[in-house]
Regions:
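N-terminal amphipathic/basic helix or basic patch
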Residues: 2, 6, 16, 91, ...
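Conserved N-terminal phosphate-binding loop of PLP-dependent enzymes in the Aspartate aminotransferase
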Residues: 41-552
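Long, low-complexity, intrinsically disordered segments
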Residues: 561-589
């Protein structure tokens, strides 16, 4: 999480008082102040829209989650009871989590961390993973729905992967030169996805970074279009946010504006934004898209993406489909096969890597040739015909990961009779059965949430699902639900993405449903949800929205700079006033 996102999270979850929020705001660089104001405005409108879209009768659904500032002594007492219980059941994990901090730098350790829940939020230390289950060093067993962030389609340590890796280890794993798994894995990858050539990288982030380099090399253009809400890894080349003027801005510490300047950030599914692509086509090398965003799985704008494909073909722009999570999940040839929208390039990395650190780029030969110059014959006068873009990596064709990939692809092909460029259906692909189980589980839980009138839904696509808390998306109750699920035997992921796998039995799924319901019922019993005055809060939201002015983009007009500064000062005062209103009236933005 970047500094600016951390501040926003503190404000929207009401973890800080208004004076502290203002102090943070004043210390921000000017571009991040713009970003923060823009995001606060967006969050206000989105919060209202989410509730209205998911609950048609607001009068019958008036429960709200308490915020961290609203926790009373009874809430704190219950949290303390749970902390004591967890310390009794997982003492070794807590001790090891504390020991690790001194030397191990963990970027995930503070994800979702709440001061009120800190005693409950240490990471578990696992002793093993097997099938659908994780076991910690205190001998506790958990149903795993984190699925190693989407890697484990077949669960932990399936026999066919263990056998393939073991055989490769016995032969050694030379990193220079080819091994027999290389040609087999790339051929099978191409057959299953319908792409012509394949490149292995060392991570998903690296795959996306190289795909962008290929797009720029092929088109001799610089700009890359990305969409708000997407996640494409941690390369500076794809990390930018959009300010209130629609300009791309660097997202946080260590990220420079020059990288953000080469990105165009648009709204995914907004047909009007296609005009921006058309108007700036001469600058744009590629459009990078998660066809179904892992952070927003309910947003599935098929018609929009079809128009993007049509436009990119017309304008000499590469369409890069990031199927890091959806690839080999929704069906063998991913969302591209399901929606019949093929990218020029596509990136992969989780399922086909089989748990090994890897990424893949696949695509049309004419573009993939920018990596190695193209195919030539060793026995004639032919030579590489395309000028190469610089790419390298010691572990790109590591034989251990290739053995794992080959075993995964072989298993998928064995279980799915769908042929190349054919869409999976319920009669031909084992993945459809898994997708249906996920749908049924999520729909049962969504019905439960509606009956209980809690502001929570599960959004899902294929076997991916996410818990979305509607009124306080980053709040203490959200994290407490996950803590209680863990304490009752279901492990989730700090990223928020959850998955069912082939290894989950019907009994496991029933247990997941039971434990989620139990966790919500516990928080209802302990008054972590309360009845709100929805009419009064609607009026407050409307007043706040009308109070915040629209600021024209005056960045290129020096004479108007003082006007902009005056307006920023007014916004600054409005933020203070808004925060005061939110806290006094207990409104969650």
């Amino acid at each position: 999480m970047t500094v600016i996102d951390d501040i926003l999270e503190k404000i929207v979850s009401k973890k800080i008082e208004k004076k502290e929020a203002l102090k943070f705001f004043e210390e921000l660089p000017e571009n991040e102040k713009n970003y923060m104001v823009s995001k606060l405005k967006t969050h206000l409108s989105n919060s209202v829209n989410m509730v209205e879209n998911n609950f048609s009768d607001k009068k019958d659904n008036t429960l709200k989650a308490v915020t961290e500032l609203q926790l009373n002594e009874e809430h704190k007492g219950f949290i303390d009871q749970m902390a004591q219980k967890l310390e009794r059941t997982a003492p070794k994990s807590k001790e090891n989590a504390s020991k690790c901090q001194e030397y191990f730098v963990d970027q995930r350790r503070t994800g979702g961390l709440k001061k009120a829940l800190k005693r409950l939020q240490f990471h578990l230390t696992y002793s093993k993973g097997d099938g659908a289950y994780l076991y910690d060093i205190d001998d506790n067993k958990y149903i795993d729905i984190a699925s190693d962030n989407g890697v484990n389609l077949f669960g932990h340590q399936p026999a066919f992967i263990k056998e393939a890796i073991s055989k490769r280890l016995d032969k050694g794993y030379p990193l220079v030169g080819y091994t027999e798994e290389l040609s087999q894995a790339t051929k099978l990858f191409s057959e299953l996805t319908g792409h012509e050539r394949v490149l292995f990288t060392q991570s998903g982030t690296e795959a996306v970074m190289w795909a962008i380099r290929i797009a720029r090399a092929a088109t001799q253009k610089k700009k890359i279009v990305i969409f708000e809400g997407a996640y494409h890894g941690l390369s500076d080349t794809v990390l930018a946010a959009k300010d209130q003027f629609g300009n791309s801005i660097a997202m946080g510490l260590g990220m420079i504006q020059e990288f953000a300047d080469e990105l165009i950030v648009l709204d995914y599914g907004n047909m009007d934004d296609l005009n921006i692509i058309e108007d700036r086509a001469d600058e744009i090398a590629g459009v990078l898209v998660e066809p179904v965003q892992s952070r927003n799985p309910a947003n599935q704008p098929i018609d929009f993406l079809k128009e993007v494909r049509k436009l990119t073909l017309e304008k000499n722009i590469l369409l890069v489909m990031d199927e890091m999570i959806t690839g080999f999940r929704v069906c063998c040839n991913g969302v591209q096969g399901l929606w019949k929208i093929k990218g020029d390039l596509a990136t992969y990395g989780k399922i086909p890597a089989g748990g090994m650190p890897s990424g893949m780029i696949a695509g049309l030969t004419k573009y993939m040739n920018y990596v190695d110059g193209g195919v030539f014959d060793y026995d004639d006068n032919s030579m590489p015909s395309v000028k190469k873009a610089l790419m390298a990596g010691t572990h790109t064709r590591n034989p251990i990961k290739l053995a794992s990939t080959l075993s995964i692809l072989t298993e998928i092909k064995k279980r799915c009779s769908t042929s190349e460029n054919e869409t999976c259906d319920s009669n031909s692909c084992f993945l459809q059965e898994l997708n249906e189980k996920t749908r049924l589980m999520c729909e049962e839980l969504n019905s439960f949430f509606k009956v209980k009138k809690v502001p929570l839904i599960i959004e899902y696509f294929s076997s991916l699902f996410r818990f979305k808390f509607l009124d306080d998306p980053n709040g203490v109750v959200k994290e407490f639900v996950f803590v209680l699920m863990r304490m009752n035997g279901v492990e989730t992921s700090p990223s928020g993405n959850c998955f069912l796998t082939v290894a989950h039995s019907d009994k496991d799924i029933k247990s997941i449903i039971r434990i989620v319901k139990k966790s919500i019922d516990t928080l209802l019993k302990e008054n972590f949800f309360y009845v709100s005055d929805s009419i009064e809060e609607d009026e407050i939201e409307e007043n706040i929205q009308s109070a915040i002015p629209d600021i024209p983009d005056m960045r290129n007009d020096p004479e108007q700079e003082s006007i902009k500064n005056d307006q920023m000062e007014k916004l600054r005062k409005l933020i203070i006033s808004d925060l005061n209103n939110f806290q006094e009236k207990e409104v969650t933005i």
